[in-house]
Amino acid sequence: MYQRQILEELSLYLQEFPAVAILGPRQVGKTTLAHQLSAQQSAAQGALYLDLESPPDLAQLSDPNAYFAAHADRLVILDEVQRMPGLFAVLRGVIDQRRRAGVASGQFLLLGSASIELLAQSSESLAGRLAYVELVPFVLTELPANPASRLADAQSLWLRGGFPQAYLARSDAASLRWRQQFITTYLERDIPLLGPRIPAQTLRSLWTMLAYEQAQMLNAARLAASLGVSGQTIGRYIDLLCDLLLVRRLQPWARQSSKRLVKAPKVYVRDSGLVHALLGLGTYAELLSHPVVGGSWEGWIIENLIASAPHQTQASYYRTAVGAEIDLLLELPGGALWAVEVKRSSAPTVSRGYHIACDDVGATRRLVVSSSDARFPMAGGIEHVPLLELMRELLALHQTNVAR
C-alpha cells in the first residue's frame, strides 16, 4: 500500500476538529485513504462508512439525527458529501450538541470530489468546525523508495499521471484506456450531476485545447473563437474545471513592481497523465517527440512542488512584458521567496531574464529543477536541486509547521 503524505496531517486534524473534509478529484484515492485511517483506530472505535451515491447507504440517512445519535461513539465517514448539501446544517447541530457535552473532535470525515470553493457554498454552516485537506494524485515522494527503479518509476509517474489506477495499471496501454474512460465519465456523468448544463463535446474540446497549451498564458479570447462561444463562457468552463481540481490557474506575481508585468494566469491541466490522455499520448517515446513535452514537464514539476509545500504557501509565476520570467514563485510562511526555474535538459542553463526577475522580486533562494538527479551549484547563486530532494525540503518545512 502506498503511504499518502497527508495521512499524518489528517490524523492530527481529526484530533483537533469535529469534522475534516478530504477534497480531491474522483478516483484519486480518498476512500482508500479514509479506510486506511479508520484501520488505525481500535476495533471498538472503528469507523462507519457511508457512500452518499449508494441508495442503501443514503437510506440510512433518511433520519440523519437519529443515525448520528445511534453512532455517537464512532467516526462517521461520509463519501461524496457534496451530493447531499442539506446534510451540512444537520452536522452543525450534531457537532454543537456534542461540543456542549464535552466531545470536541474526531466525529466526521467528509469526502468530496470538489474544491474548497465549491464545497464551501454548501458548508458555510460548518465554519470553525471543519478543516480541509486536499488529496492530490500520487506525487514523487509517495512512491516506494527503490533506487534501482527510481528513474523508471519517475518516468512512469510523469507519463501515466498520479491517479492510482492509472499509475498502477499493468501496462501503458491499459493506463491510457483507464484515463480516457475517466475523462469520458467526468464529461458525460459527473459534471452533469453537479448541475451545469455544458455540452460534453464542447468541454472536451476546451480541456483538450488546455492540454495542448499546457503551461501557457491563458488567452480566453482565442479559445472562445475556436469554440464559437464567448470569453465569459470560457471563463466559466475553466472555473468549473478548477473547482473540480482538474485544472490549475497559476496566477501572476501580484506585488507592486516598477516593471510592466504580464497579468494573465498560466493554465495547467493538473495531472500529467490526463494531459497525455487528452492528446492521445500512450508511451514515453510518443511523449518525448510531442511539442507538449516541455509544458507537460513544467506542469508535472510544479504540481509536485506545490503538493509538498507548507500550508499558506502562495504559488505564482513572474513575467515582465520584455520576457524576464520565473516559472514558479513559492512564497513560504515566514516570508521566504523561492524562485524555481524548470528545465527539461539534464545540463540546464538559465537566461539573463531569470536573474533579472529574481532581482525584481527579491528572491531569497534561486533554484533550478531539471531532469538531472545531481545537486550542484550554478553561477549567480543558483542551486540545482533534484525534484525529489526539493520536495523533501518542502515537506520538512510543512511538517514543522503542522507540528507547531
For each predicted feature, which ranges?
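Hydrophobic positions on the alpha1 helix immediately C-terminal to the Walker A/P-loop
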Residues: 33
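Pre-Walker A adenine-sensing motif
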Residues: 1-14
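Conserved catalytic/switch belt of AAA+ P-loop NTPases
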Residues: 88-110, 114, 124
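Short glycine-rich substrate-engagement loop in P-loop NTPases that contacts/grips substrate
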Residues: 45-75
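Hydrophobic anchor at the beta1->P-loop junction of P-loop NTPases
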Residues: 22
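Interdomain motor-coupling "hinge/lid" segment immediately C-terminal to the ATP-binding subdomain
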Residues: 105-106, 113-115, 119-219, 245-246
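Conserved lysine of the Walker
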Residues: 30
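Accessory nucleic acid-recognition modules appended to NTPase machines
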Residues: 172-336
